[in-house]
């Protein structure tokens, strides 16, 4: 962290925080989270309904021959339950955004109170890591069901785990750093931890986005049944790519903020937290909601696993 001010001059905020903006974001995230949750539950319930020749939710012994011939003998069938669990991190990420902006609204009324400041600072920092976890897991399932695991930049056996591991490390570093930032003696260490966490997040996300483009470019060559399925997978991948780019932009701006330090331009202007943090994270959740109407992981898995030889 560069050019820290002396402890006597240090304040929690370098500006007067807007209570109205924090309340507005709280409401927007509540509405978005409710719609997102209902949408995921609805999609999962639709996929759970028994359908003719749909092995996505039928016993293995009834669909084994179809799956083996269409998807390969070593294919591990995906279930609605295991797929549904991939959405849980993003849900809690949205909850963190809600609680974070509630705490920010409270903090705006008392800018000397440390507790609400720490809550909003930490939760708004680490929430994107939970978004990323959902994106990583959904992408891994998409590659699996389309038999494109060979397109993973890292070993297909550890592909999803590799990205999630980086996400967890980033999450822990930012959480620890966010707590230390609230103290005069710990703010330099806290800033360094957050910077390290953001760098890790950006590096892993960068590799992941490259992997998404690689998949988009090579899927027609690798997927054995590419010409026999609709474009629902394409809309799902587009959803993941757009969300990833939004989070990447947000993380880059936050990284610059902490590299600049306490006396930097970004940290002293509140609109950055809304334009380059709140808006991208809100849009990322909205992209999931809108994208599900055109193609979601449940419809993609159902379609791929329903193929007949």
Curated annotation (Swiss-Prot):
It is a multi-pass membrane protein. Keywords: Membrane, Transmembrane, Transmembrane helix. GO terms for cellular component: membrane. The chain crosses the membrane at residues 22-42, 83-103, 119-139, 162-182, 193-213, 233-253, 278-298. Disulfide bonds: none annotated. Belongs to the lipid-translocating exporter (LTE) (TC 9.A.26.1) family. Confers resistance to molasses (to a particular toxic element present in some molasses). This is Protein RTM1. It comes from Saccharomyces cerevisiae (Baker's yeast).
